[in-house]
Curated annotation (Swiss-Prot):
The keyword Metal-binding applies. This is Fructose-1,6-bisphosphatase class 1 3. The lineage of its organism: Bacteria, Pseudomonadati, Pseudomonadota, Betaproteobacteria, Burkholderiales. Gene3D superfamilies: 3.40.190.80, Fructose-1,6-Bisphosphatase, subunit A, domain 1 (3.30.540.10). GO terms for biological process: fructose 1,6-bisphosphate metabolic process; fructose 6-phosphate metabolic process; fructose metabolic process; gluconeogenesis; reductive pentose-phosphate cycle; sucrose biosynthetic process. It comes from Methylibium petroleiphilum (strain ATCC BAA-1232 / LMG 22953 / PM1).
C-alpha cells in the first residue's frame, strides 16, 4: 500500500459506511467534495504572494469584516466543489448574507452544508496558520430547496463536523459521531491519509488561550478564572499555566486536540448587541462536535454548546472548549457568579490586567 499501511480518507469513509447498512453513500460523497475544496484552498494558501492572492478584496462580508482576496476565492471553491453532485440541498457560508441556492441545473440532495471557507484570514498576509471549518446536517426537506428555518438546527443534529488546517502540513480533521480523526494530505499522492486516529484530549491541562486585550470587558467568572491561572503556583490553583493566543480558531482547536488545553472566546460587554464573537452554525458547532468526540467539553460558558437552538444563520455566541476539568470549572464559576463585580483576591477589582482609566 503506497500509504504505508494507513487508510486513506476514501477507505475510512467506506469502512464507516459499512457500519450503517442503510447508508446510501451520499454523505461520503459530500465529504469527499468538501475535502477536494480544502485541497484546492491549501494550494492557493501555499503559493501565497506568488499567486497574487494576498491582501484585501476591497469588500466586506455580512459580519462587517473586511474580506481578504483568499476569503472570496475560498468561498467560491467550496461552492463549486459541492454544488454539482446532487448531495447537498443548500449551503450557508460566513461570506454570504443569505443561504446559497444551488443553480437550477443541479439536483438537490439530502444534506445542508455550513462553512467558514477561510478561518483566521486576518493572519494570511503574515503567513500564520489558517483553515476551513464545516458542518453537515440532514435537510428536513430533502431533494428540494431548503427554507431559511431549515438551517436553524442545534449542533446535536450534525452528521459530520470538521476542519482543514493549512500549516506546515495540511490536515483534515473530522468526526462522523464516532471519534475524532485526523488525516494528513500526502502532496505526492494527493491523498488524505489517516495519521491520527481517535484523538483524545487530556482531561487536565496547564494551558489556556484567550485574547487578553479584551480583559476589561470580561464577565466576573472569566476574570476570576484567568486571574487564578496567571497567579500560578503561588495562587489558588497552586500550579503554573501558560497562555496562548493565535487569533485562528482552527489553529487553537488543533493545538488543543493534539496536546490539550482550554480555549475561551467568551461573551463580554465590548459590544452589548453581540452575544459573543464566533459564529454558532459554522464555527462553534462543528468545533464542539470534534471536541466532544475527542473526550473534551464545549460550552457557552454556562451550558453545553451543541444544545443551543440557533435563531439566525450568522448568530454569534460565547465559546469555551477543551479539557473537561477546565471547562467544567469555568461553568461552575459562572453558576457562582456574584451580582456585583468580581474582586480578585490578589489584584482587587481590576484583576491581573490593569483597566484603562
Amino acid at each position: 500500500m503506497p500509504t504505508g499501511g494507513k487508510s486513506t480518507l476514501t477507505q475510512f469513509l467506506i469502512e464507516e459506511r459499512r457500519k450503517h447498512p442503510a447508508a446510501t453513500g451520499e454523505l461520503n460523497a459530500l465529504i469527499t467534495d468538501v475535502s477536494l475544496a480544502c485541497k484546492a484552498i491549501s494550494r492557493k494558501v501555499a503559493f501565497g504572494g506568488l499567486a497574487g492572492v494576498l491582501g484585501s478584496a476591497g469588500s466586506g462580508n455580512v459580519q462587517g469584516e473586511e474580506q481578504k482576496t483568499l476569503d472570496v476565492l475560498s468561498n467560491t471553491m467550496f461552492l463549486r466543489a459541492t454544488e454539482w453532485g446532487g448531495h447537498v440541498a443548500g449551503m450557508v457560508s460566513e461570506e454570504l448574507e443569505a443561504p446559497y441556492t444551488l443553480p437550477p441545473q443541479y439536483a438537490r440532495g439530502k444534506y445542508l452544508l455550513m462553512f467558514d471557507p477561510l478561518d483566521g484570514s486576518s493572519n494570511i498576509d503574515v503567513n500564520v496558520t489558517v483553515g476551513s471549518i464545516f458542518a453537515i446536517h440532514r435537510a428536513p426537506q430533502p431533494r428540494q430547496d431548503p427554507q431559511p428555518q431549515d438551517y436553524l438546527q442545534p449542533g446535536t443534529t450534525m452528521v459530520c463536523g470538521g476542519y482543514a488546517i493549512y500549516g506546515p502540513s495540511t490536515m483534515l480533521v473530522l468526526t462522523l459521531g464516532d471519534g475524532t480523526h485526523a488525516f494528513t494530505l500526502d502532496p505526492q499522492l494527493g491523498e488524505w491519509v489517516l495519521s491520527h486516529p481517535n484523538l483524545r484530549i487530556p482531561e487536565k491541562t496547564r494551558e489556556f488561550a484567550i485574547n487578553a486585550s479584551n480583559s476589561r470587558f470580561w464577565e466576573p467568572a472569566v476574570k476570576r478564572y484567568v486571574d487564578e491561572c496567571l497567579a500560578g503556583s503561588t495562587g489558588p490553583r497552586g500550579t503554573d499555566f501558560n497562555m496562548r493566543w493565535i487569533a485562528s480558531l482552527v489553529a487553537e482547536t488543533h493545538r488543543i486536540l493534539m496536546r490539550g488545553g482550554v480555549f475561551l472566546y467568551p461573551r463580554d460587554s465590548k459590544d452589548p448587541n453581540k452575544a459573543g464573537r464566533l459564529r454558532l452554525l459554522y464555527e462553534a458547532n462543528p468545533i464542539s462536535f470534534l471536541i466532544e468526540q475527542a473526550g473534551g467539553m464545549a460550552s457557552t460558558g454556562r451550558k453545553r454548546l451543541l444544545e443551543v437552538q440557533p435563531e439566525d444563520i450568522h448568530q454569534r455566541i460565547g465559546f469555551v472548549f477543551g479539557s473537561t476539568e477546565e471547562v467544567a470549572r469555568i461553568e461552575a464559576y459562572h453558576r457562582d457568579e456574584p451580582p456585583t463585580p468580581y474582586n480578585s483576591p490578589l489584584f482587587g477589582k481590576r484583576g491581573l490586567f490593569a483597566e484603562a482609566g
